[in-house]
Amino acid sequence: MPNINELTLAKELIKFPSVTPKDAGAIVFLSKQLKKLGFNCKILEFKDKNKKSKPIKNIYARLGKKSPNLCYAGHTDVVPPGRIEDWTVNPFKPSIKKGHLIGRGANDMKSSIACFISAVEKFLKKRRKFKGSISFLITGDEEGLAINGTKKVVDYLKEKKEKIDFCIVGEPTNPNKLGEMIKIGRRGSISGTIMIYGSQGHVAYPHLSNNPVNTLVNICKKLNEHKLDKGNKNFQPSNLEITSVNVDNTATNVIPASARAQFNIRFNNLHTSSSLKKKITSIVKILSKKNKCKFKIDFHVSGESFLTKPNKTIHMARSIIKKVTKITPVFSTTGGTSDARSVSYTHLTLPTKRIV
């Protein structure tokens, strides 16, 4: 069995310029590393039937055939590095500076993958025979559209009747120090684009036109003032943010025919995406009708909110983290969405939690 150093492995992973949707060889490399440890690896490539997204490589690897199956979920894709000149090092040529590993994906989340693989290698050297199974679910589509990634792997596993009993999503989680926090849930996310249609005209003759901007401003004001809820013991209050307003009108003396606004809602488990769609549509419909404008709303749901109630296994993980780090992690649902949303909605898993 090979000796796997987590820092060395993290550096090797960072060298792959796997900016979504490009894999750049990262998944095949991981498969080779896991096979050396005895894992049965399956590379799964998915593509969108409508060809709106590019094919994505994923991997599901398992060691053992019995339950319980402890799964580590993560992703090898990274966000674009931006201008290379703005980096102190080449983002895909990792370097250590002042005790920090610098490179694209060092934090989110190639180092996490490397650490878990290294931990598994050390565990297997001590206990080659153990009760249950260890598995990895790694995608190359988390930072992008997330269409051909974890969700489709989970669907594949359901078809194969492959059961995951406990899943750790290794995303960066702690605000300051390792061991501070365990994510036991996440808020949902829904984005929307509101189009308001009036009638074009000259500003000198406003009575001959219908300004959609006025209607859109009133809608944005109403949405901004509307309090969705006060939160609960597990979640902070749901929040709606107007993210853009656009008229596409360069003439200062012309009343435009249409106006557009975009928004995003991060919502807790007091709502569903369906209930929020109805609420938003109702507000837009009432104000549009009042001003005799037509409207159109397009919604995109990134994920529903979910909560895993702390059980015996999660409390055990908390105790282990405290023993190793000397810090008692808090249970939290703060922050953005993650692929835990895809795992949590299946019958594959009991709890879904998130630890780094």
Predicted feature residues:
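Residue-level recognition of beta-strand->loop/alpha-helix junctions
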Residues: 45, 138, 299-301
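A structural signal for isolated positions on well-ordered beta-strands in alpha/beta enzyme cores
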Residues: 42, 71, 135-137, 296
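Acidic/His- and Gly-rich active-site-bordering loop/insert found
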Residues: 2-102, 124-130
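Metal-dependent amide/peptide-bond hydrolase catalytic core
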Residues: 1, 173-177, 184, 190-348
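Single conserved hydrophobic/aromatic residue that forms the stacking wall/gate
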Residues: 347-356
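Fold-level recognition of mixed alpha/beta catalytic cores in primary-metabolism enzymes, strongest
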Residues: 111-222
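Short pre-catalytic strand/loop immediately N-terminal to key active-site residues, enriched for Gly-Thr
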Residues: 97-107, 328-332
